Amino acid sequence: MSQRRILTFLLFAAFLTFAIVCYWMLQREDIHLGDKFAVVKEGVLLRSMVPTISRLQEIDRRYQIKTIVALLNDEEIKHPALEAEQNFARQHGIRFIILRMGIPLPEQVTEFLEIVNNPIRQPVLVHCWHGTVRTGALVAIYRIKEEGWPLQKALDEMVSYGFNLEAPRYKSMLDIIQGYASKTESKVAPATNY
C-alpha cells in the first residue's frame, strides 16, 4: 500500500471514530456540550447558560419547562438573544422572569427560592449569561437550603461548572453562599451521644 492510501485510510478512520464518539455523546442525557445544562432536581430545577433557541426547544421538549428565570445584568438584558428567548417562552406558554442581578441580594434569593419551590412553576430553568457565577451561586444556595447539602459539596459543584473560588471579585458571592450555609447549619439539631 502506498503512503498516500495509508494516510487517507487513517484520516478516514479518525474522522469516523470522531463522528461515532460525537453521536454517542449527543445521545447521552447527562452530557451536554458546552451549555452547562444540568438537571438540578428532576421535575423541579434545571440550570444552563443562555440557551440557543434550538437548545431551548430541545430542553423544553424533554423537560416541559414551565418557568425560565434569567439572572442578567443591564447590558445582557439588551442582547438580541434574550428577545428571541422571551419570544420562544411566550409562544410556548412558558413564564419568563428576569431577575436583574450582579451579586444576589437576599430579596432576590428569596424570590428565586419562592419561584423554584412553587409546584405550579416547575420545572424551572435558571440561567445567567455564562451559566457559571450567578446560576452557580443560586443553585448552591438552593442545594444548601432546600436539599441540605454541606457548603463544600455545593462549592465543588460550582467549580465543576467553571466557577473560580480564588477570584477576588467573587469573594462577596462566596460570603453570601457561606452565610446561607451557616444559617442552615445552625438549624440542624446538634448530635447527642448517649
Residue spans for each PLM region:
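Cys-dependent protein tyrosine phosphatase-like superfamily
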Residues: 2-124, 140-194
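Short cysteine clusters
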Residues: 128
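Substrate/cofactor-recognition hotspot
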Residues: 131
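Ser/Thr-glycine-rich phosphate-binding loops at phosphate-binding pockets of nucleotides
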Residues: 135
